[in-house]
Amino acid sequence: MRRGAPQDQELVGPGAPGRGSRGAPPPSGPVVPVLVFPPDLVFRADQRSGPRQLLTLYNPTGAVLRFRVLCTAPAKYTVFDAEGYVKPQSCIDIVIRHVAPHPRNYDVQDRFRIELSEEGTEGRVVGRKDITSVLRAPAYPLELQGQSDPTPHPEPHSWTASSTAQPFPENPHPQLATSSFLLFLLMGTVSVAFLLLPLQDELGSQLPQILHVSLGQKLVAAYVLGLLTMVFLRT
């Protein structure tokens, strides 16, 4: 365990701060929405370059935000850029690698927590979001890898309500109802329209000023469009 990080929210990555966020006072201002994509992490044990995922964190506000990545099982993951800053109306990519792709860890659900705080106010958390993480078994039989322990052993979460890990459902391809499909299609069309509209400070546009959007609105539209794309790919 890295020095300075509490046991229930240990930072996975270099540069753990001197104190955790469990005892931090609640934010006095409005809560900042934590926009991350994808909304959950699914690692594959047979991934050629090793089980890894790219997590994108968006900052739709007009201020610099400090972020930290915490985990319930820090020994199983390596997080590159586990803490840092996100510029206003910008985004940053965080690479997460699963370093324990063993059969006993298959289908065991862990959790990551993304915490946001204002620049220069240590410990004053203004936004947080929990995302789940799971390691999936290879598509080919375990005997081909010489593994002998295919039974997963759930580990308890230290800052979640459940005392045991709950595996993800084995059927990741639910069918969308017609009403849901039409709603998602409408949301996707609106998101694409927002991405095609000119920026507020863009010159030479023939569209009226009321149809000009900000960069933050385009980031939110891109985030929603990415979520809809994931839903369509899983159906």
From Swiss-Prot:
Q: Does the keyword field hold Nucleotide-binding?
A: no
SUPFAM superfamilies given for it? PapD-like
Gene3D superfamilies the record matches? Immunoglobulins
Q: Where in the cell is it found?
A: Membrane
Pfam families linked to this entry: Motile_Sperm (PF00635)
Stated name of the protein: Motile sperm domain-containing protein 3
| Region feature Disordered, mapped onto this chain | 1-30, 143-170
Q: Which UniProt keywords apply?
A: Membrane, Transmembrane, Transmembrane helix
For membrane topology, the record states: Multi-pass membrane protein
Which residue ranges traverse the bilayer?
180-200, 213-233
Instruction: Report the residue ranges that make up the MSP domain in this protein.
Output: 33-145
Entry keyword Membrane? yes
Q: Where's it mainly located?
A: membrane
Query: InterPro entries attached here?
Result: Ig-like_fold, MOSPD1/3, MSP_dom, PapD-like_sf
Provenance organism: Bos taurus
Please tell me one Gene Ontology term that the record gives under cellular component.
membrane
